């Protein structure tokens, strides 16, 4: 079903959003890259890396929560969403050593260092951090370290971040990392989650199923399940 309707160029209807949604769904089900997945990644990478010189903060192309159902990405600039999602998908499907992927990570790493871990606003920032935490080398980069420290400075003692920080996506992203700063934040966030779990076992007020998936995945990353 996820492969149905794929165009000859590898995309689904020449749509960035639909192609990213299909690829993420395939990551959850197929796991290993196949020819259709490689073709879709090729289409997405060609578009993302063309757009990356430089990132365009085009307000008319902002990504909203409605575009992101069942995706680990959050509302923000189209450019950072496209690049972050593409690098994330390239890394989880085994393309982390591709020259273009490495070049894009290197440029984002330098940008993250220059901006002290804040590529953009908090929600938009998640889309870049999401790509960094799944890369074998860049998960330990200076930009990742700075982004994690930036989050630690705004997390309160209860384990929450400000409302502009996407809570469930942030917990899930940080759970991929082993740095002391990430571990401390995750531990505090888990205590908050323990206190706020719904009676039916889910989390959140809306998109409960997706929030719960992100929490369970984070718990598994930390070998607590």
Predicted regions mapped to residue ranges:
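Preference for long, amphipathic alpha-helical scaffolds in soluble/luminal domains
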Residues: 1-225
């Amino acid at each position: 079903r996820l492969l149905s309707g794929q165009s000859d160029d590898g995309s689904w209807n020449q749509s960035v959003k639909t192609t990213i949604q299909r690829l993420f769904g395939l990551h959850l089900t197929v796991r290993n890259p196949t020819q259709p997945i490689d073709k879709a990644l090729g289409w997405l990478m060609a578009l993302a890396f063309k757009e990356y010189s430089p990132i365009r903060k085009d307000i008319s192309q902002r990504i909203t929560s409605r575009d992101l159902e069942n995706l680990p990405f959050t509302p923000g600039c189209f450019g950072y969403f496209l690049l972050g999602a593409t690098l994330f998908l390239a890394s989880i499907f085994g393309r982390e050593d591709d020259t273009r992927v490495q070049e894009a990570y290197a440029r984002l790493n330098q940008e993250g260092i220059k901006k002290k871990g804040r590529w953009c606003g908090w929600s938009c920032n998640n889309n870049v951090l999401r790509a960094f935490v799944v890369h074998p080398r860049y998960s330990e980069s200076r930009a990742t370290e700075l982004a994690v420290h930036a989050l630690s400075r705004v997390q309160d003692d209860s384990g929450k971040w400000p409302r502009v920080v996407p809570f469930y996506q942030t917990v899930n992203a940080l759970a991929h990392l082993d740095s002391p700063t990430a571990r401390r934040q995750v531990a505090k966030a888990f205590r908050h989650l323990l206190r706020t779990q719904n009676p039916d076992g889910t989390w959140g007020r809306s998109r409960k199923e997706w929030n719960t998936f992100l929490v369970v995945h984070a718990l598994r990353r930390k070998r607590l399940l």
